[in-house]
Amino acid sequence: MNDTYQFDAAGALLSTQLPFPRRQGKVRDVYDLGDRLLIVSSDRISAFDYILPTGIPDKGRLLTAMSRFWFEQMDAGRIGQNVGSAGGDGSSNPRSISHHLISTDVPEDVAAVVDPKPLEGRVMVTRKASVVPFECVVRGYLEGSGWKEYQATGEVCGVSLPAGLKQCDQLSEAIFTPATKAEEGHDENVSYEVMSQSLGEEQSSQLRRMSLAIYQDASKIAAERGLLIADTKFEFGVVDGELMLIDEVLTPDSSRFWAADEYEPGHSQRSFDKQFVREYLQESDWDRNSPPPPLPESIAHQTADRYREGYERLVGKAFA
């Protein structure tokens, strides 16, 4: 197992080495199983586009469980109905939004060649997709890089906003603010026009419509459970000519979750995501131009507790 799985001293899974072609992302190890992909969510954590040397125990399992929850909401017809989908040529028709998930069980062909136990609860078996090279960011509240850009320009990714907004204010309507994708290095916020010039207006419009619809439907589900989704990023790909939701969805790594009963604009909010790590690093002496420092054990465990609390509030049951 030592060659297959790498853990840190706290038991967080930092890396996997399965006997299949692998592509390693910031958090996930993606394996090519021939006709499908195996996505393994490690316990790595990234911040400011750097991978930290410290893992967050059980983070990968929590991410997978939350993605599974949201994909199940889509399957149940609570998210993305009658929005439309687009083919690779940008053609559209009214239909439900599809996703790439096949299963969250460890495949038999994988379990036959490695110890499957460390993988249990942290894998997604998915269809292969041609990935759209933009992250589809939706912001319902003004925080993070959006808040910083607004302070400087009064806009976020080319979207003009009213004057006088405070940090974490709710926007009158959610806005679509794409970003370029980067496996390594820094993602870059761009305007919708930049995306449209790259992908074409038809597909860009469809991505915006689908992203806003998923965010709005998911926000209603979260609100029923006392949670606010401040912002999130989606990824899409084309499978057999159909544009569909891929990768993780509405997890603490891709989204900011706040408690509705604690919400108070004008300052940063207590969150159930990795903002806790971001704030710790911002207050440290790290210059963001060099490899980040290890997290103290207390910060890693408090972050794990935040992830777990967010999951349990959302799903309504204890994380096992």
From Swiss-Prot:
Its EC number is 6.3.2.6. It catalyses: 5-amino-1-(5-phospho-D-ribosyl)imidazole-4-carboxylate + L-aspartate + ATP = (2S)-2-[5-amino-1-(5-phospho-beta-D-ribosyl)imidazole-4-carboxamido]succinate + ADP + phosphate + 2 H(+). GO terms for biological process: 'de novo' IMP biosynthetic process. Keywords: ATP-binding, Ligase, Nucleotide-binding, Purine biosynthesis. The keyword Nucleotide-binding applies. It holds the Pfam family SAICAR_synt. Pathway: Purine metabolism; IMP biosynthesis via de novo pathway; 5-amino-1-(5-phospho-D-ribosyl)imidazole-4-carboxamide from 5-amino-1-(5-phospho-D-ribosyl)imidazole-4-carboxylate: step 1/2. GO terms for molecular function: ATP binding; phosphoribosylaminoimidazolesuccinocarboxamide synthase activity. The keyword Cell division does not apply. PROSITE patterns: SAICAR_SYNTHETASE_1 (PS01057), SAICAR_SYNTHETASE_2 (PS01058). Belongs to the SAICAR synthetase family. This is Phosphoribosylaminoimidazole-succinocarboxamide synthase. It comes from Rhodopirellula baltica (strain DSM 10527 / NCIMB 13988 / SH1). The lineage of its organism: Bacteria, Pseudomonadati, Planctomycetota, Planctomycetia, Pirellulales. The gene is purC.
